[in-house]
Amino acid sequence: MWDGEKMAAAMVQMSCLYRGMLAVRNHGIRPLIPGLVPSHFRAFSMKKEPELEENPYYSKYEEKIRKLRSSKPQEYESRLEKRTELKTEPLGRSRQAEFVKYMEKELDKRGKDGDGGFTKDKTLGSILNLEMVQEKSGAEITELWMQYFSKKDTISAVIPSSTFDVIFGRAKSCPTFLYALPQNEGYEFFVGQWAGNELHFTSLINVQTMGENAPSQLILYHYTDLQKDKDIVLMTAEMDSKFVTVHQAQCLANQVQLFYGSQRLETFRLVETFNHKPEEFKHMAVIAELEQSGIGPAVTTK
C-alpha cells in the first residue's frame, strides 16, 4: 500500500495536468472507445463533482470512479479534497517528484500481482518457431514477423539492434515518462513505465481514479532473443481494446521512438527532466514536441 501523503501529492499534481490538457483543442482525431460496463458492477447514486466531471474523459472512467466511491468512500473524498488544495499551482507545471515515486511503487506492486487480462511471461518462443528461423536472415525474419501481425488486431515492429540499445539504455536511467495521445478534446495523458523489456502504459486519469489498482491498458513487448545473431529486436503488443485502439497504440509506440530513440538531445532531455528534475517538468513541452515532430496535430496556445 502506498504512503497516504505521497498518494495525495500525486493526485494533486495529476489534477493540475488535466487543467493543462483542457487548454489544448484538436478536432482531427477520433475519440477513445468508451469502456464497457461489467455486469457485476452495482448501480448507485453518486454525488456529482463538477471539477472532476469537466474532464472530457470522465465519462470513459465514470464506472471505475463509481466503484471507488462505493467501496472506499473515505479514500475517494480524501483524493477530491487534495485536488482542491493546489488549485493555484501554475498551469504547465506539475509536482512530478512525488508522482515519479508513486509510479515506481505501482510498478513494484504490479510486478508482484501481474496485470489482469494480459499474458504473463510472454516469450518469443510462444509466438515464433525459434529453431525454424535460425537459418533465416534478419530481413527474412522481419518480413515473416510483419506479415504475421498484419492480420492481428495489434501492432508490431522490428527494431534495429543499435536503435534498441539506445532506447533501452536510456530507459534504464529514465524508466518513466508522460505521453500525450491526441483526441477530439485535446490530449489524453498516458504514463509509460518500463519493466525489463516490457513497457506498460496506463492513462493518467485511470491512475488517478484507481490508485494502486490501475491496470496496464497497453503493454509493448520487446524480444531480444535474436538481437545478437540477427541484429534485430522484435516488438509486439497487447492492449485493452475497450480503452486503446490499434491506431492509438501505434501512436504511443511512435512516441517511444521519438522520446527515447531520438538523436536530438533536446527531445530526450524532456524524459530526463521528468525522471531527475521533476520540479522543472512542463507537460505542455511534450505536446509541443509532438507537434514539431509531426506525430501530434498543430497546437494552439493562448
Swiss-Prot record:
It is found in: Mitochondrion inner membrane. GO terms for biological process: mitochondrial proton-transporting ATP synthase complex assembly. It comes from Danio rerio (Zebrafish). It is a peripheral membrane protein. One of its GO terms (cellular component) is mitochondrion. Belongs to the ATP11 family. Transmembrane segments: none annotated. Interacts with ATP5F1B; involved in the assembly of the F1 component of the mitochondrial ATP synthase (ATPase). GO terms for molecular function: protein-containing complex stabilizing activity. Has a complex stabilizing activity in the assembly of the mitochondrial F1-F0 complex. The keyword Hydrolase does not apply. Keywords: Membrane, Mitochondrion, Mitochondrion inner membrane, Transit peptide. PANTHER family: ATP SYNTHASE MITOCHONDRIAL F1 COMPLEX ASSEMBLY FACTOR 1, CHAPERONE ATP11. InterPro entries: ATP11. The lineage of its organism: Eukaryota, Metazoa, Chordata, Craniata, Vertebrata. The keyword Membrane applies. This is ATP synthase mitochondrial F1 complex assembly factor 1.
